[in-house]
């Protein structure tokens, strides 16, 4: 099986390769980030006896996962049928095909799908300016796209939370000029979607992953292509034609029930009274402190309810409790010692009031910027390094 490797940084080549792959599909394709040495080596090091997912005639798109909690990304094999199934379901959910503005990296499924959706709609994708996202530059791209697109053709984009926040703060007209804005990549602060709604922007929260060809649940409702259920352990399972065929160099994680393939996610969820899916955390978000289970995502949400900016809850080893909750808090200013202590105590009390003593943070540290991945997710590995560095420097509040 020949594998074509294309660097995501060469965006024009990546777009052309993706479109050719969708319509021709004669070669297995992988669009990789510049720093993806490990995935590249794994693909290039494929031995002659390596099993081919889907058989000799299958030429999948191989996409590396973007999770922030694993050192080794999975190499996900997606068939053209899976990608097209997802694209069609998105088109149906949004009210019809349209033109897409690509702001996200083409090494990630969210960025890739903007190209796929545009291509199958008969439109070329519009590439936003490269480099660090700038809301005003993005607004200019939207304005130019609107001017060059027929009024009858909807204009869409996909963003992550930090990009949405930047647009709300600096270029809200970019959001209101679009017919729909998909926002995924992890937890989306409800205050952001509320602000977007107040200015008349249509923002849709998406849930999905590389293994499901991208978002397959919009605002808590599964797309037509997706079937979602909650296992007895509270973990979300997903089925549908948009599922991957397997991992490139790992055993398949898919299970089968009555001939139906199911993917067991790493997310916890529940179905609300109105039938929507609510994500309550990740499996690895659940820790034990003093024998009591604590959901780190719930800790973050409680801290946000106090008006804190971006926060990251982590578990640190504790000689008494086994583990305790630590909070890394992002602030624009440089707080004084007394301000740090006051804020830390308020955060601890707020979380304790919401979730109980075991969830109350025993370590709180402040930073100008919480580290993020290229897709806008908190990089928990770097965040842990950051909070440990602050502790060693004596610059963290501890109880």
Locate each region found by the language model:
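AMP-binding/adenylate-forming
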Residues: 27-28, 78-88, 99-166, 204
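Conserved ATP/PPi-binding loop(s) of AMP-dependent carboxylate-activating enzymes
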Residues: 222, 231-256, 260-261, 282, ...
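AMP-binding/adenylate-forming catalytic core of the ANL superfamily
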Residues: 240, 268-359
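Gly/Ser/Thr-rich phosphate-binding loop
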Residues: 167-219
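Conserved C-terminal "lid"/linker of ANL adenylate-forming enzymes
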Residues: 287, 314, 326-328, 348-399
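ATP-dependent adenylate-forming carboxylate-activation enzymes
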Residues: 6-10, 32-40, 123-145, 294-299
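Conserved AMP-binding A3 loop
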Residues: 58-88, 92-95
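Conserved pre-ATP/AMP-binding loop-to-beta segment of ANL
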Residues: 11, 47-64, 96-99
């Amino acid at each position: 099986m020949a594998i074509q490797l294309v660097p995501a940084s060469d965006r024009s080549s990546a777009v052309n390769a993706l479109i050719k792959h969708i319509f021709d599909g004669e070669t297995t394709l992988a669009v990789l980030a510049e720093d993806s040495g490990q995935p590249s080596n794994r693909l290039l090091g494929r031995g002659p006896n390596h099993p081919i997912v889907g058989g000799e005639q299958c030429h999948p798109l191989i996409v590396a996962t973007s999770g922030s909690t694993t050192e080794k990304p999975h190499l996900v094999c997606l068939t053209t049928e899976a990608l097209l199934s997802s694209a069609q379901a998105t088109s149906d959910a949004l009210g019809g095909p349209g033109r897409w503005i690509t702001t996200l990296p083409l090494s990630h499924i969210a960025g890739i799908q903007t190209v796929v959706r545009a291509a199958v709609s008969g439109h070329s994708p519009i590439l936003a300016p490269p480099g660090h996202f700038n809301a005003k530059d993005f607004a200019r791209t939207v304005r130019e796209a609107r001017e060059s697109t027929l009024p009858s053709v909807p204009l869409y984009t996909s963003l992550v939370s930090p990009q949405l926040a930047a647009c709300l703060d600096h270029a809200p007209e970019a959001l209101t000029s679009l017919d729909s804005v998909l926002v995924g990549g992890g937890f989306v602060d409800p205050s952001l979607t509320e602000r977007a709604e107040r200015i008349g922007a249509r923002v849709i929260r998406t849930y999905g992953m590389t293994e499901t060809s991208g978002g397959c649940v919009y605002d808590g409702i599964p797309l037509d292509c997706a079937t979602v259920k909650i296992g007895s352990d509270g973990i979300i399972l997903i089925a549908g034609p948009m599922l991957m065929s397997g991992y490139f160099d790992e055993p398949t994680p898919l299970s089968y029930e009555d001939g139906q393939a199911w993917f067991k996610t790493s997310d916890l969820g529940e179905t609300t009274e109105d039938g929507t899916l609510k994500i309550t955390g990740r499996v690895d978000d659940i820790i034990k402190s003093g024998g009591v289970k604590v959901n780190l995502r719930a800790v973050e949400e409680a801290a946000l309810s106090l008006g804190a900016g971006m926060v990251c809850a982590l578990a640190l080893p504790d000689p008494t409790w086994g583990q305790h909750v630590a909070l890394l808090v992002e602030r624009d200013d440089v707080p004084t010692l007394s301000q740090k202590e006051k804020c830390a105590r308020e955060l601890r009390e707020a979380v304790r009031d919401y979730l109980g003593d075991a969830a109350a943070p025993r370590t709180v540290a402040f930073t100008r910027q919480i580290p993020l991945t290229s897709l806008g997710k908190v990089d928990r590995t770097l965040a842990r390094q950051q909070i440990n560095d602050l502790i060693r420097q004596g610059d963290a509040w501890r109880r």
